[in-house]
Amino acid sequence: MWPSAVALSRWLMTNPSAVCGKRALEIGAGCGLTGLVAARLQKQWDADSSNVLDQQQQQRQGVIISDFNTTVLQNLQHNVVLNSVDDICNVVGLDFYQQSGTASSWKGMDGAARDQVDVVLAADMICQLSDAVGAANTVHDALLPGGTGIVVCADAAHRFGVDRFHAECQRVGLETSVQDLGELNKGKLLSMGFEQTAGYVEGMRLLLFLLKKPQQ
């Protein structure tokens, strides 16, 4: 479990409206923690009588969890069932390097064009420069105009290529802001448990990229 996946999941739990009532896609999912949390939040939101979704939101709401590795995809499908979100959550093969950064749809690994989504989620999906390029292309192609990308990565001192991501997002036309997660919510998002995650180093900075695809 990467530290950024835990951090992004905690951020979503404090900002459930970021995914509730929306169609979300997690890219480079690994074990799928972030996508699973998004799906559980959607189910809880829908079950809470104080939260009212219109018919269009109810029909649209759902989560797609993706990765490119066949074994990982099989494990993701198991995790979706294990967490009882298989009614609103699907697993799809997606390779960053098959996305152009100029398209109005994203491609599954079967080559089929897929509908764009409201929200793209990603955590620690960059470990080399080409990943930054591919991830930016994927976020652009996957998002509807007006859609939002929410990405958390360890800083460039710990993940090679992350320092390129901001510029690559701008290249494909995404509006981009970057925040240090340690400075949000009085540091509570990073307050405990990270020593148990893979690759965590004391003092590691986790960066929150908020991306916006302009309306056409």
Map each language-model feature to its residues:
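S-adenosylmethionine-dependent methyltransferases
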Residues: 1-216
